[in-house]
Each structure stands twice: as structure tokens, then as C-alpha cells.
């Protein structure tokens, strides 16, 4: 499973709630709503509408709707891709989930792109877009390859 932006959020959320997938890639995702509220260029608007209030009024609801809260349930190998200059979904969103997974010794890789923003996959530097494609292709190729069979 793979997604970016809201799709990245859904990817992070999904792997925290099912082990159905053999590999996942979450790009430029919101992973922790309480910090997105104050760090994203739209966090103070989006989260209030999407969650239905302010973080200090409903901290439990903000946390419950955050993939980071469910990191203990993530068993799917997860590739996290983020751009360093992303103001929509700041890079700390990816860093928080990555650190949570590594602290639990889970299979996670974090790839950061310097001098790129939320639009990396659509209008980023050509060399970065190509590198991103190669990283994703390699990630899924290695994790989805058939397991070797044992001969007799």
C-alpha cells in the first residue's frame, strides 16, 4: 500500500490497524495531529474542522486519530518519504513516526529530500523525482519478491 499527503495519512493509519499488507510507503503524511495543528501551514484550520475542535479542548480525540498513537500496532515494513521544506505536512510528522517505529525495532526506513516541498512527486527536481521512484520501486521489489523455495 502506498499513499501521499492524505493518502500518506491513510497508509500510516491503515498499517496501524491491519497486517494485511506485506509492505507500505507513506509519503508526506500527517502522523500526529496535535503537532500538525501548530506546525503546518493549514494545521490550525484543517485539524479544527476535520477533528471538530481544538487540541486543548479534545486532546484524546486528536491523539486517537493520529497514526503515531497506533505505532505499537504497525508490523508492516514501512518506508517513510518526506521533503525537508514541506510546510503542509512538516517533516517532523514523518520523523515522529519513524522514531516510534525504530524504538520498537520495527522494519522502517526514513528518506528525506532536501530543498523539496509538498509537491515533490509532482513538480520536484527531476533528479529527486527519479530518485524517489527508484527508492519506492526497490522497497517494494525487495519486500514483495517471492520467498525462495527450499529444494529437496
Predicted regions and their residues:
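Active-site-proximal cap/loop segments of hydrolase catalytic domains
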Residues: 1-152
